[in-house]
Amino acid sequence: MSSDTEIRLAGEVRRRRTFAIISHPDAGKTTLTEKLLLFSGAIQIAGSVKARKATRHATSDWMEIEKQRGISVASSVMQMEYRDCVINLLDTPGHQDFSEDTYRVLTAVDAALMVIDAANGVEPQTRRLLQVCRARNTPILTFVNKMDREVKAPLDLFDEIERELGMSIVPFTWPVGMGKFFGGVLDLRRDQMRVFSPGEDRVKEGGDEVVEGLQNPALAERFGSPYMEAASEVELVREAAPGFDEAEFLAGRQTPMLFGSAINNFGVQEVLDALVELAPPPGAKAALQREVQPVEPKFSGVVFKIQANMDPAHRDRIAFLRVASGRFERGMRLKVARSGKELRPNTVVTFMSQRRELLDEAYAGDIIGIPNHGVLQLGDTLSEGESLQFTGLPFFAPEMFRSVEVADPLKTKQLRAGLTQLGEEGAIQVFRPVAGTVLLLGAVGQLQFEVVAHRLEHEYGVKARVMPARYNVARWVTCDDAKELQRFIDGNAHRVALDAVDAPTVLLEYAGELRAMQDNWPKIQFHALREHAGLVFQKQLQG
């Protein structure tokens, strides 16, 4: 590779910022996503979730069931440019039932933006998602939303977030008042106050009104006691909080905090600026064979998500791939490491929610979509020839089970085809019992079953009966001795099923049954997690 090409590749990688937005449901995550697109110039008008009964819907909530219920259940991917940076934004499912899909999305990003509802503080889903980020040392920015409502006192929020999340907080902005007395925010880094005024769908010309100097006497005159209170709180916080430390932030131990109101376009530009200035460009990615650097000349990437029916008119499946290294070019020869098959993708797309545009090139950090007809699976690595297997893309053992039958026997083929596609997405797990014909669905929450039934009917024309199944525990099984594994399967055929990649799974009613089985079959390993393609994490959970 010539030095000019190397310089260009390094420059393109430096420009990339790939991050996910995480929050508890209803914290305003989808609204903030919209407004980030608005401020970057990617869209001209925001389609408010609140207006979903009218003709507009949130740009990132594209699936029919999401529009009806106002929740994000599939992760959307959007690309935009801002301040000479290419930003890849992943909007994750806000509903807790879809935490598995969210986990996989978080393996594809270099930073996370955590949205907290100022009225509710830290909520359960936020905690769970943050644990995932902390386990991966993902840098996190915090946006405290909905300051235009009656909310918790800022100091209480500060203490709660620091205590609950176990991270040190560095306030970049601090609110003046709340609810109907919300006057704006004190920008602690720029020594100015940004004045709040309710916004609409469009970005205000000229931006927010700014008053220079945090000690400016005009602020006390204009905003009275809310300003005086905020100024004294800032003094306290500055004494208690550490200064911003880039190394601590990049290690996921310190989070900058900004306040605002996404629905009113307030505080959004500051979030966008902080993401561009602070979030890291793509870093090295771990594979079983070696560590892959983003500036390596050869292309490689990993499939972290598969989505069926993004365009119902075409019954399509799109494999979402995070570029790990090199430069992608349309039509280049790529190898699927798992199967050895060659691909030459010509219709590769980039995304604006469900809108797609053909792309000619992509670099490390970019998310590209490859139309897929069963060739690609979750976790697959594509490369220019090297056999790489990127690690860290898990499946979790389901905690709820349903049997599924078709109401019309003539639609059995469509049912299996639909479940195969939906299973490939990883939003539901499909099991085929070794002894028996009734398919089983496994999920981590009830909503997943509702979504599958809805999508089978509306996308595949199959009315399915989803009924309770007697199972409550699932474990993937492996054994170093192939004959012993087969003996186990034969001896427990009524309790063993095969998943989407034919990985044998034992399905049980009670945790006690699992303990007894572990005692009776000491050579068999039971796993609550597995990597894609049947490769199981070497992690045994007790019970």
Please place each PLM-identified region on the residue numbering.
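Structural and coupling elements of P-loop NTPases
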Residues: 1-543
